[in-house]
C-alpha cells in the first residue's frame, strides 16, 4: 500500500497584477502557478515573487483557495 502525502498540499498561486489597472500588460488575463507546501510549517497563505509572462516582469503571487 502507498503512503498518504500527509501534511503536503497542492496550492495555486495567482498574480496580483489583476488589481493594478494602470500597468500596461503584454496579454490580458491572470497567470497562475501551482506548487506544494507543508501545512504544518507554513499555516498562513504564501506570497512569492515570481515572473508573470502577462505583465512581462516579476510580480507578487498570492496563494488562493
From Swiss-Prot:
One GO molecular-function entry: structural constituent of ribosome
Subcellular location: Plastid, Chloroplast
UniProt keyword annotations, A-Z: Chloroplast, Plastid, Ribonucleoprotein, Ribosomal protein
Pfam families linked: Ribosomal_L33
Gene Ontology biological process terms in this record: translation
One Gene Ontology term, aspect cellular component: ribosome
Family of this protein: Belongs to the bacterial ribosomal protein bL33 family.
Protein name: Large ribosomal subunit protein bL33c
Amino acid at each position: 500500500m502507498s503512503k498518504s502525502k500527509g501534511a503536503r498540499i497542492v496550492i495555486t498561486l495567482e498574480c496580483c497584477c489583476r488589481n493594478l489597472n494602470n500597468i500596461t500588460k503584454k496579454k490580458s488575463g491572470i497567470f497562475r502557478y501551482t506548487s506544494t507546501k507543508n501545512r504544518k510549517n507554513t499555516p498562513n497563505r504564501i506570497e512569492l515573487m515570481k515572473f508573470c509572462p502577462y505583465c512581462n516582469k516579476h510580480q507578487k503571487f498570492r496563494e488562493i483557495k
